[in-house]
Amino acid sequence: MKQHLWPLFLEAIKRDVVPALGCTEPISVALAAAIAIGELGIKNQASNVKMDVSVSANLMKNGMGVGIPGTGMVGLPIAAAIGAVAGDSNAGLEVLKNLTDSDVQAAKLMLDNGQVTVGVADVANVLYAKVTVYYQQQTASVTIADSHTKVIAIEKNGEQCLPAPEVESVNDKSNKANPFTEARLQDIYDFAMHAPLDDIGFIMQSKSLNDALSIEGLSGHYGLKIGATLVKNQEKGLLSGGLLTEVLARTAGASDARMDGAMMPAMSNSGSGNQGIAATMPVVACAEFLKSSETQTIRALMLSHLTAIYIKSYQNKLSALCGATTAAMGSAAGITYLLDGEIEQVSAAICSMIGDVSGVICDGAKTACAMKVSSSAGAAVKSALMAIDGIRVTGTEGIVADDVDQTISNLATLANGAMTQTDVQILEIMMHK
């Protein structure tokens, strides 16, 4: 076992599995706005500023149609406005945790008065947001790039102001050693199975946060009400009970609430709340259905989240490939373990997942993401059950190879290569429909 990687795995988990209030792409805009207001020291006058927001094409795609927590609205303009009015610049991905009804009204008035403009920047960065604030004779601009809380530039009245705020060092450790350049899935599995429970027990926080979101979503007041619809039709007798229905409903419920702007944080994975949900809730629902022990649940969640990060490490931060599908591959691993599978079966489940849901597009963050999240959760259950029975998509089929790590690499080649043009086409359709 490569135990020298274990401290790095822990760092990766603590960096990439963190609470996030609201979809992380518009939240990065809100954070930049909050920091810019702080630079000018005009918190009490924030509703009187004008703002220019410039974002990468990918961030525009993921910010156009998603609910902003506590506002009842969607999109980047309200994210920028509410970030300026109510944002906590030291709270990272929970920048909007303290907003009030009066803050929301002030932010909406800013939009009504045309104080916020949003456009697409011609930049190489896949994840990029620059917010420039104008107040009387003063200006401040904040640029976030490459990671949702990574502040790369702050400018006040034409002068560079560095170093960046502490939020960067707290939430982004991208300069740290990357354990995944050396790691293989076997190493992820060994860590999840054998690391001391005292070192990894914190992963149960993902269960607490995302299960609370699920319960809220199942109330039937959010988004497309996918989770609530599944529960209702189970009660009608149109759907049977059992593991699959439980996983689908619990997972969809969390995503319903998340994508419709519930004022509750999700435990994210790789910078995405939906990916955190997809890596958490199928495992949680399965563990409860099987009456698994707390120890088993901890190890299954750690296997799921770290596998999701490992798979994502091969890919660009944002792409045309739906991140919920790759995160749910982590859940396939965790569920397989809960069903008494070992590394051979875990590998088989991931290969089958890639044979099933590879190529599902990301056409922006929105309430309909809950459909893709629940579909991916269903694929995770299906692949795990197949693996336990010794069945998998084989290395002669499509992009799936005999070796699981090669299969993961093949998926990344698809996402980082040919699907870049897919991304361009998706945004073009979205902007002109």
From Swiss-Prot:
Name its GO BP terms in alphabetical order.
L-cysteine catabolic process to pyruvate
Which HAMAP family does this entry report, sorted A to Z? UPF0597
Superkingdom: Bacteria
What protein family is recorded?
Answer: Belongs to the UPF0597 family.
**What protein does this entry describe?**
UPF0597 protein Spea_0809
Q: Which GO terms describe its molecular function?
A: L-cysteine desulfhydrase activity
Concerning Pfam families, the annotation shows: SDH_alpha
What InterPro entries does this protein's entry cite?
Answer: Ser_deHydtase-like_asu (IPR005130), UPF0597 (IPR021144)
Which organism was this protein described from? Shewanella pealeana (strain ATCC 700345 / ANG-SQ1)
